[in-house]
């Protein structure tokens, strides 16, 4: 969601603090009223941000952004600029002045087959080719369907050169949906861990024209392995837990064989998103 927020502050400079990454970014798009500061802020599902005000005097900053709908566009603050995550025409406001911008997003889906490596010590084959991304629970292979643990996805792709004349282009890798935690590498460089929407990392620095190799490790919970052990009826199983409590049905205990499988793995769609940041200061 993206909303215009008001704070009872005067004569101070707002900053956005990210409690997950620890990143602190000055807000470069706000309006100082007689008793309040107004600014647009975007939050992903379940996301939290701190808005902190430090001493300082506003200096000729843009005061707002206008779009075709009532709420501000989805945006991310960066140092002296802002990234807009919607296509369309927008108007930056500064007093009686305005600046029209046309925002474009370029998306490329990384479709096709993936090589997926599992831990064979936990019942799955060591390597499976996925023609497309889907939940492990949809697999015809029993060891994959009930797998709990970490799997490594690998994919090679060719990237065209970025268009000339756009030196400030930023490129992000968006993993779509995954369950439950992922870690990303591109061309051998670790890009960090993703565990909440949007499952997105910046790849500008490490994406190269030509051949690229993407690796995503995904880990799920124990639930599916316990369900599988309860269903298969094998003499030797890796777990032996008779029943559990399912959220939303009170304190009634349910046999694990009756518990639904939880979608797991990299679900996608995985895509590269390119955008041009909007400069708000020199």
Where on the chain are the PLM-derived regions?
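Aromatic-lined ligand-binding clefts that engage carbohydrates, nucleic acids, or primary amines
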Residues: 6, 157-159, 163-187, 194-195, ...
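A beta-strand/beta-hairpin structural motif
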Residues: 194-202
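Carbohydrate-binding surfaces of carbohydrate-active enzymes
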Residues: 1-150, 158-166, 203, 271-282
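A generic beta-sheet turn/junction motif
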Residues: 9, 177-179, 207-209
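Short, well-structured beta-strand segments enriched in hydrophobic/aromatic residues
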Residues: 48, 169-171, 209-234
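Glycine/proline-rich low-complexity spacer/linker segments in large multi-domain proteins
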Residues: 57-74, 98-112, 220-270
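Short beta-strand segments within Ig-like beta-sandwich modules, predominantly Fibronectin type-III
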Residues: 29-31, 191-195
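Short, surface-exposed tryptophan/glycine-enriched loops
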Residues: 153, 158, 201-211, 222, ...
């Amino acid at each position: 969601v993206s909303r215009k927020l008001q704070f009872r502050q005067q004569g101070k400079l707002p900053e956005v603090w990210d409690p997950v990454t620890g990143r602190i970014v000055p807000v470069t798009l706000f309006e100082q009223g007689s008793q309040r500061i107004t600014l647009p802020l975007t939050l992903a599902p379940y996301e939290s941000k701190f808005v902190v005000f430090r001493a300082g005097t506003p200096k000729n900053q843009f005061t707002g952004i206008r779009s075709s709908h009532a709420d501000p566009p989805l945006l991310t603050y960066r140092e002296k600029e802002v990234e807009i995550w919607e296509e369309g025409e927008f108007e930056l406001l500064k007093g009686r002045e305005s600046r029209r911008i046309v925002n474009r997003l370029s998306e490329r889906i990384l479709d096709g087959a993936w090589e997926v490596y599992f831990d064979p010590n936990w019942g799955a084959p060591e390597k499976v080719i996925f023609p497309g991304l889907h939940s492990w629970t949809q697999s015809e292979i029993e060891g994959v369907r009930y797998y709990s643990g970490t799997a490594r996805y690998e994919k090679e792709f060719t990237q065209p050169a970025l268009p000339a004349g756009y030196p400030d282009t930023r490129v992000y890798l968006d993993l779509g949906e995954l369950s439950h935690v992922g870690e990303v590498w591109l061309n051998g460089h670790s890009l960090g861990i993703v565990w909440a929407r949007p499952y997105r990392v910046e790849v500008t620095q490490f994406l190269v024209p030509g051949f690229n190799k993407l690796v995503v490790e995904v880990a799920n919970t124990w639930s599916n392995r316990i369900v599988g052990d309860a269903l298969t009826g094998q003499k030797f199983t890796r777990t032996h837990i008779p029943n559990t409590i399912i959220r939303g049905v009170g304190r009634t205990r349910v046999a694990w064989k009756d518990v639904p499988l939880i979608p797991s793995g990299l679900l996608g769609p995985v895509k590269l998103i390119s955008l041009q940041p909007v400069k708000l200061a020199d």
